[in-house]
Amino acid sequence: MLKCQNNASLGLDLGEKTLGIALSQTGIIAQNLKTIFFATHKYDRLIAPLQEIIFQYQIKTIVLGYPKHMNNDIGIKAKISSDFKKTLENKFEQVKVILWDERLSTVQAIQMLKTNNKKKGKILQMKDEIAATIILQNYLDYIKLHTNKEH
């Protein structure tokens, strides 16, 4: 079991029946961790496996994908993410939960997997955790850029 520094973060790509999970132990590089499959819209079933991951990796920050429409409108999927954020904050009070614009992250993930010659089944299996990796990496890059400007 890997132990990590105090700036360990998770990236989450929440779908109707999948949760893609990415991890950064250093605050610099995100890597895909896993995809959790669950019954459609049964988001409460994600709490126990997330609790294990949060404890195992000593997670301090969760970056949850926020699926805005391309015109910046907030739809039902964004509302679901917002509600899930509240659930995470209530269950894991010690963890900071951030909503992060995830537009096109799944499209990027699928393109990346196709570029790496992954088969269709593998693409469907991995797209959510790769999307979570993109979400988390975008957040980490943003933090690094804005932290460097302050110093």
Swiss-Prot record:
SMART domains: YqgFc (SM00732)
Annotated compartments: Cytoplasm
GO molecular function annotations of the record: nuclease activity
UniProt superkingdom: Bacteria
Any GO BP: rRNA 5'-end processing
Listed SUPFAM superfamilies: Ribonuclease H-like
UniProt keyword list: Cytoplasm, Hydrolase, Nuclease, Ribosome biogenesis
InterPro entries in alphabetical order: RNaseH-like_sf, YqgF, YqgF/RNaseH-like_dom, YqgF/RNaseH-like_dom_sf
Keyword presence, Transmembrane: no
Enzyme type, top EC level: hydrolase
GO annotation, cellular component aspect: cytosol
Alphabetized Gene3D superfamilies for the sequence: YqgF/RNase H-like domain
Pfam families: RuvX (PF03652)
Keyword Transferase (UniProt): no
Documented EC number(s): 3.1.-.-
Main location: cytoplasm
Family: Belongs to the YqgF nuclease family.
Database matches in PANTHER family: POLYNUCLEOTIDYL TRANSFERASE, RIBONUCLEASE H-LIKE SUPERFAMILY PROTEIN
Function field: Could be a nuclease involved in processing of the 5'-end of pre-16S rRNA.
Name of this protein: Putative pre-16S rRNA nuclease
